[in-house]
Amino acid sequence: KKKNGMKVALASTVMLLMVSPAFAQKYKVAKVERTRILVDQKWDAQPDAEAARFIAPYKSKVDSIMGPVVGHIAHDMTRHRPESELSNLLCDILVWGGKQFEEQPVFAVYNMGGIRSNLAKGKVTIGDVNDMAPFENKICFLTLKGDKVLELFQQIAHRGGEGLSHAVRMVITKDGKLKSVTLNGEPVDPEKSYRVATLDYLAEGNDQLVAFKSGTDVFAPKQKENNVRYIIMNYFREMQAQGKVVESKIEGRCVVE
């Protein structure tokens, strides 16, 4: 909306005006008030019986779809810059996912903004993965020359860190400058080509990671099953089939000095 040439944002505001056409012109909005209501577990203490009855048949169906367990994690995993257990795990899963496509990426990048929830210790359900990765992002592989890889890491440093896979060790400054970076313990060779795993969203240069737009030999399968959340679920299922509890830790992939 615009008022007096200025944009006016109305958040969490619902206005219901029920007037007949004959009287509509007599009414003018005198004031609009808004408030935010935090929807959290405090509302569980006194559930509305009528609302619960209405939701029950739908909840049962949703729970049957989202409730199945795909794996287990050893401890709570959260996402935060410059490095986190959860972002580390997701990037390692992208590298792992390469085998499905006969790809061998040197490293992977997953944007922190694409991780929409944390994981709690114990069971991981389909619903947990959907909450964490709700977007229709597909796994993507591309090739970057070393000079563009360095440019990419500079852009990641400017953002204060993003999700990086195990091969990466980078040091950044508090004001977002890249101090150093290695891949598998070796300096990045500006003339060498590197295969990278990421999301198709990032491969388009989004989230200010424009170096990705220089990628060549881009492979981003668009089938539904190549959605990143299904790659994540498949990883958990494979670990569960092997009797493994999934672990991840902070190990200096991105350090601020």
Predicted regions and their residues:
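Short hydrophobic/aromatic-rich motifs at helix boundaries and adjacent loops
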Residues: V14, V62-G67, A120-V124
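Acidic/histidine-rich, surface-exposed loop or edge segments in extracytoplasmic proteins
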Residues: S64-H80, L209-D217
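Feature captures C-terminal
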Residues: K26-D40, S84, N88-C91, V95-G97, ...
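Amphipathic repeat-derived elements
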Residues: A56-V70, G160-I172
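N-terminal targeting signals for Sec/Tat export/insertion, comprising classic cleavable signal peptides
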Residues: E33-S64
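Low-complexity, intrinsically disordered regions enriched in charged/polar residues
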Residues: S12-T13, L17, A52, K123, ...
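Bacterial Sec-dependent N-terminal signal peptides
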Residues: K1-V32
